[in-house]
């Protein structure tokens, strides 16, 4: 296992060193479990009580955390330990690539264009007219349809399916089982008979985008479904046709977005939320978990819906009252009218 000196790590995050700059750590571990060969961090002051007992070889802390540490501790002092942790986790990352080189069982069209140092895993299929940028990694069993373009340094884990004409930017990460560019849910109804509408648009994904396992992003009906730069989408999400997600937005697991929804920049969408289509959500909106969004949101802020978990007996009473809310409202108005007389 590779070792890293405190000096080397400090240079990556612009940290001030307190202690031995030559100490070597091999990886990162939780505060309460790190040993003297490991680096740890504290991102919340409520955990300061654990600093004195920490056995870590080095700690990432803020200036205000120092007084809670042992005098013998080796410290990397920064403004934001969590951001520093994220940067160092990338720097020290030992996750293997999804593929190394081009496997002999991969099927690559003669008309595909491959950049330098492209890797393609076993049984992957690269169809006609595909363009793969430098250092692209295509995992085992992936399908890359006709005329797909994938930018440099993007990695697809095993069994990702990218349909024809999709464009994916650089430095993206797509987890296993994701499907990008499948047909949107477009049909016309002729007296009870469904007529399928061919989805002739595409999907355009920007740079530095991450897409979670088994997430589906449908192609547009006529125009493109668009995911802008620096968007992160968790597992098991459904992004319908012609959705547009703005820069810097984060989408947690299990979210469903209906067609032609426009989500602004720097939004946070909580897990299992369901959002109606053909409307807009403005920039810097937070929707808490299991939110049901039926109308446009025009003001930045935090929005919630749904009933938090209750004991079953309490919930049943609440549900019963909800069914009678119209009757209760009429009785209340009648009482108010009498009192006003």
UniProtKB/Swiss-Prot annotation:
Pathway: Bacterial outer membrane biogenesis; LPS lipid A biosynthesis. SUPFAM superfamilies: Trimeric LpxA-like enzymes. PROSITE patterns: HEXAPEP_TRANSFERASES (PS00101). NCBIfam families: lipid_A_lpxD, PRK00892.1. InterPro entries: Hexapep, Hexapep_transf_CS, LpxD, Trimer_LpxA-like_sf, UDP_GlcNAc_AcTrfase_non-rep. GO terms for biological process: lipid A biosynthetic process. One of its GO terms (cellular component) is membrane. Keywords: Acyltransferase, Lipid A biosynthesis, Lipid biosynthesis, Lipid metabolism, Repeat, Transferase. The gene is lpxD. It comes from Histophilus somni (strain 129Pt) (Haemophilus somnus). GO terms for molecular function: N-acyltransferase activity. Catalyzes the N-acylation of UDP-3-O-acylglucosamine using 3-hydroxyacyl-ACP as the acyl donor. Is involved in the biosynthesis of lipid A, a phosphorylated glycolipid that anchors the lipopolysaccharide to the outer membrane of the cell. This is UDP-3-O-acylglucosamine N-acyltransferase. Pfam families: Hexapep, LpxD. It catalyses: a UDP-3-O-[(3R)-3-hydroxyacyl]-alpha-D-glucosamine + a (3R)-hydroxyacyl-[ACP] = a UDP-2-N,3-O-bis[(3R)-3-hydroxyacyl]-alpha-D-glucosamine + holo-[ACP] + H(+). Belongs to the transferase hexapeptide repeat family. LpxD subfamily. Its EC number is 2.3.1.191. Homotrimer. The active site is at 241 (proton acceptor). It comes from the Bacteria.
């Amino acid at each position: 296992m590779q070792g890293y000196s405190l000096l080397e790590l400090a240079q990556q995050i612009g940290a001030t060193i307190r202690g031995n700059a030559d100490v070597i750590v091999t990886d990162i571990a939780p505060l309460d479990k790190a040993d003297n060969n490991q680096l740890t961090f504290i991102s919340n002051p409520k955990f300061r009580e654990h600093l004195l007992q920490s056995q870590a070889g080095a700690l990432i802390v803020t200036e205000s955390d120092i007084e809670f540490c042992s005098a013998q501790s080796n410290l990397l002092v920064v403004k934001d330990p969590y951001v520093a942790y994220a940067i160092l986790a990338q720097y020290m990352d030992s996750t293997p690539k999804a593929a190394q080189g081009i496997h002999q069982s991969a099927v690559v069209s003669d008309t595909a264009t491959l950049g330098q140092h492209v890797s393609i895993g076993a049984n992957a299929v690269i169809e006609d007219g595909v363009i793969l940028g430098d250092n692209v990694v295509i995992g085992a069993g992936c399908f890359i349809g006709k005329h797909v373009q994938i930018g440099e340094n993007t990695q697809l884990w095993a069994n990702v399916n990218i349909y024809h004409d999709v464009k994916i930017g650089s430095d993206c990460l797509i987890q296993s089982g994701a499907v990008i560019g499948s047909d949107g849910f477009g049909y016309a109804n002729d007296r009870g008979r469904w007529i399928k509408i061919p989805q002739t648009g595409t999907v355009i994904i920007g740079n530095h985008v991450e897409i979670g396992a088994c997430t589906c992003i449908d192609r547009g009906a006529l125009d493109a479904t668009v995911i802008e730069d620096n968007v992160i989408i968790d597992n098991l999400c459904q992004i319908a046709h012609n959705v547009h997600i703005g820069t810097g937005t984060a989408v947690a697991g299990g979210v469903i977005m209906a067609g032609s929804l426009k989500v602004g920049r720097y939004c946070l969408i909580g897990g299992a939320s369901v959002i109606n289509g053909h409307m807009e959500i403005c920039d810097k909106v937070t929707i808490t978990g299991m939110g049901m969004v039926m109308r446009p949101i025009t003001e930045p802020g935090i929005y919630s819906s749904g009933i938090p978990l209750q004991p079953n007996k309490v919930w049943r009473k609440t549900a019963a009252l909800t069914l009678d809310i119209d009757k209760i409202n009429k009785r209340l108005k009648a009482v108010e009218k009498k009192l006003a007389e």
